């Protein structure tokens, strides 16, 4: 079977793990959850740093652990790259020495590829003490890649960095899965990192899998509600760039074969694939198509579902799932007053309104 199969049972402290997980053979699979949910424990089991009481771990056709068959491949033979929260560089080696440390067979072409990808050339003769946090993490990622791993495990690699350093490293992480055809398991508690990087998302809580699947599916599911504030509830679209406005700084993106959206200008070629987030509280609903309005996006839709939500004791909101096309949905958040006034019901034909300026660069990521 292709991909990464993780199945194990284990008790660690007060957390009882009962994991059944299938992850794709390439791309970025994010593991998300609150502190103490067991995110790091899962990748430690995959790497072999922790041995479960029972279970099976396999990567494609390679069985790494099987309690029934008595298989437990040692850590150093699993061919796994591991990037920790802290860079763990050797202080007495310069960057080039750190990159080459542990490489079984030096490959000049591979070395140049990694150095170029992570923009490490200016750093090669410098020592870790002179590097910023972001530079250290880029070196740590490079060292892991140069071990020619079959899988890359990343344990919150940006957690120790301040916001400017995170912004420095994120573009390099976005290039990883495009440049290396290996699965990347990425542990994080950051919704923004998930939006920018992940293809697949697993939500974990107290050692149990709450949800696992394609990012766009899990993102809008009930499993994500506890982690999304009122302003963070949103819909994710896999879209592509269809048009650049000749006069204004706006880009039209296709959400489906017929539904499109004008957003703030995206500097990328026509046809580029992107991931797009539309916040639910940026979507309004009208029963009649407006004729003169400043809102650039008026999309005909059908009411698919109406849900009441209680984000706090003193607040109540209504989540409306709108079908733009048969397989393309958009969530809108409205007030109970608006629901009563519009008398919305399943099957009603309505118009969704989204300002062109409401979808900004932070809501858009070029996909692999």
Curated annotation (Swiss-Prot):
Species the sequence originates in: Vibrio vulnificus (strain CMCP6)
User: Which cell locations does it reside in?
Assistant: Cell inner membrane
- Specify which residues bind ATP according to the UniProt entry for this protein: 33-40
Write down what this protein is called. Molybdenum import ATP-binding protein ModC
User: Could you name the Gene Ontology cellular component terms for this entry?
Assistant: plasma membrane
Predominant place of localization = membrane
Gene Ontology molecular function: any one = ABC-type molybdate transporter activity
What reaction does this enzyme carry out catalytically?
molybdate(out) + ATP + H2O = molybdate(in) + ADP + phosphate + H(+)
* Sorted UniProt keywords: ATP-binding, Cell inner membrane, Cell membrane, Membrane, Molybdenum, Nucleotide-binding, Translocase, Transport
- Sequence similarity: Belongs to the ABC transporter superfamily. Molybdate importer (TC 3.A.1.8) family.
UniProt key word Secreted: no
What is the primary gene name for this protein?
A: modC
Under which main EC class is this enzyme filed? Answer: translocase
Q: Describe its membrane topology.
A: Peripheral membrane protein
What quaternary arrangement does the UniProt entry report? Answer: The complex is composed of two ATP-binding proteins (ModC), two transmembrane proteins (ModB) and a solute-binding protein (ModA).
